[in-house]
């Protein structure tokens, strides 16, 4: 049971992405600890706004290793949008900075997460 005012998304795809040289869809320079989510139009809605609002903190059910000495984290802030073709509706794409090898090795990991509304 989720606490009042929280949402849990179970068994969602997660992937990792790398720095492109651009700011996030929210207008910030990307930092380790952020993630991207689908835009509403990617899952049958309309518009470019994210399916989970920017600034929302997602708490994952497993620790995820991040590169560059960050280590393991289970909390990620939504600050970007992306396209995850053939991924679950509430897929998350975790920012891995410039460590392309680590992002590729991450692959697709199923996880669940909770966030406050």
Curated annotation (Swiss-Prot):
Annotated EC: 3.2.1.17
Keyword Hydrolase found: yes
Active site positions, chain numbering: 89
BP terms from Gene Ontology: defense response to bacterium; killing of cells of another organism
Keyword annotations: Antimicrobial, Bacteriolytic enzyme, Glycosidase, Hydrolase
Listed name of the protein: B-enzyme
Enzymatic reactions: Hydrolysis of (1->4)-beta-linkages between N-acetylmuramic acid and N-acetyl-D-glucosamine residues in a peptidoglycan and between N-acetyl-D-glucosamine residues in chitodextrins
GO MF annotations in UniProt: lysozyme activity
Organism: Bacillus subtilis
Additional free-text comment from the UniProt record: Usually lysozymes have a catalytic site with Asp and Glu, but B-enzyme has no Glu (two Asp for catalytic site).
Main enzyme class: hydrolase
